């Protein structure tokens, strides 16, 4: 069984919860979420992200044999809600990505590109929500933000709204940008009920979302049907959103999301199921049509879905962290680390760290003094953004920087 861990575990009610990145040529047995007793290390449960014949979801694979169901990974950190005792985790694309080679583009291929809500004691899937049937390597494993908020989506900016919402009602929700499409989704935490969703950066893969059911309709113009087809896909396989983390401030009830204005000219390279060919696509990146800046930060209200502010810049944006003092810290692919005003987006401070700020910034206090720490060095996301702005030439040094706050 081949698998690897690309992110750390979490602790949930005395258990170590771990997702994993299924290797492209691994079997379905690698694609699992596991819980181990934190005291003994004994495995408590494991949940498969690819159903076996006869299990719920098996029928969504279009008759594809179990041994040819590959790569529904859970390669980023889950979230845990102690009140409901549920774990929330996101999943990735299948291999190959184009579904015409994998039983048909009309099949769901559960549980790829979904949010899974698991009982922390048993690993049972309590509910799931599929964000998109993915033909392009637009994974959805990123952070799920757990928030209690009033819900009043503004139809002027929020494209898809559940008509049953009572504006102003308080809900315990999961929100954020869970996938590379850059679409914000807000779901009820207990039930998975779809509440609202909206795009951010340019996207052309979703035509609509049914507000009443949450069902996503894929743009048929973006679906591959044969080998050697080339299509403009937005965002590209590096996002939109990617693993660089967003942030949330309860003081402003606002989420802050690092994104890239990127698309790709994706071409199908095979009509066969072969894990050695991985996604079955060539995916050269490009700037989104009409864009000149690669990086952007969206500040979005968790209550209304409105854009509070937006920052754009030539260099790609990487991870963010919000502080209680009204600041959002974040780095970019050109080595700049900066502090934004969390209400206005104004850049209040900036320093050149010399190489891409690829690490996740953290803030902590020692003896009453607050600090912000971050690491630098090359990464896949920084590199893909850098190719869109080749006049910027950061270094490659891997360093740790710690800054004291006033």
Indicate where each model-derived feature is located.
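Noncatalytic, solvent-exposed loop/strand surfaces
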Residues: 1-406
